[in-house]
Design a protein with these regions (language model features):
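Active-site hotspot residues in diverse enzymes, especially metal/ion-binding acidic/histidine motifs
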Residues: 1-249
Length: 249
């Protein structure tokens, strides 16, 4: 499959999710609207970024909560490729290194990159950045791009190398002191850290909605409903944990 076809597929998913073809997107919010999809945050070690498990009536994405928030967003986009365009019915396990693995995994990484950073929009953004930085992409521009699109340093460097805006040698220098480079430019460091401890085991989406639905219909008792939530690592919904004071503003 060539890059143009992957680009077109990424555009279709943007449209399916109700987004335009150029703006930054919040994939965690958007995927909550996909029928039958549950997303599970779970620590998986350092070599696996995520999994896609497809079923007859529902699907599950498992996202490695030990990876940075920026990488989790990229992984979520990667899993959307497996959900919509991978004809294999089995579970897909996705590796940490972007652009590695079999042909299907490489396509999924390319799809994720195009979904989050649409080619035309990225090209226009790069040109604007280069105009204000002596015609080259420096570390400052890399930090801006990862903050603008809310993805990891590795994902941004991977794409800039593909676009021939960075050499492998220059990119390698930018893999160091990632958090410090962002803080020095005035950015918050949340993007560069794993999920908070209280959210490293957590389920969102279809499973939670379904549990609520069967309770409302009287198909399960309150005790069973709470048991279902606890099995999905949602003690916060059972015991009211981690709920901040509400502010209507």
């Amino acid at each position: 499959m060539n890059d143009l076809n992957i680009w077109k597929r990424a555009e279709r998913i943007r449209k399916l999710l109700g987004e335009d073809s150029s703006s930054p997107i919040d994939l965690f919010a958007l995927t909550n609207s996909i029928n039958g999809l549950s997303i599970v945050n779970y620590p998986m070690g350092e070599n696996i970024s995520g999994m896609c498990v497809k079923g007859k009536h529902s699907n599950v994405f498992a996202i490695n909560s030990l990876m940075t928030l920026g990488r989790q967003r990229f992984t979520l986009a990667h899993e959307l490729f497996h959900l919509y365009y991978d004809n294999e019915p089995s579970t897909s396990i996705c590796l940490k290194n972007i652009g590695a693995g079999n042909e299907k995994e490489i396509q999924a990484d390319q799809f994720a990159s195009y979904l989050i950073m649409p080619p035309l929009a990225l090209t226009e953004m790069i040109q604007k950045l280069k105009e204000s930085s002596s015609g080259v992409i420096t570390l400052n521009e890399v930090v801006f791009l990862e903050q603008y699109y809310q993805i990891s340093r590795q994902a941004v460097l991977y794409r800039l190398i593909q676009e021939r805006e960075l050499s492998h040698q220059d990119a390698e220098k930018m893999r160091q002191n990632i958090i410090q480079s962002a803080i020095n430019l005035g950015y918050d460091d949340t993007l560069y850290k794993p999920s908070p401890l209280n959210k490293r085991y957590r389920t969102y989406g279809h499973y939670i909605k379904l549990a609520e639905k069967v309770l409302e219909k009287g198909l399960v008792s309150r005790g069973k409903y709470e048991e279902l939530l606890l099995e999905a690592f949602r003690s916060d919904l059972v015991y009211g944990e981690d709920i901040d004071e509400e502010i209507l503003d």
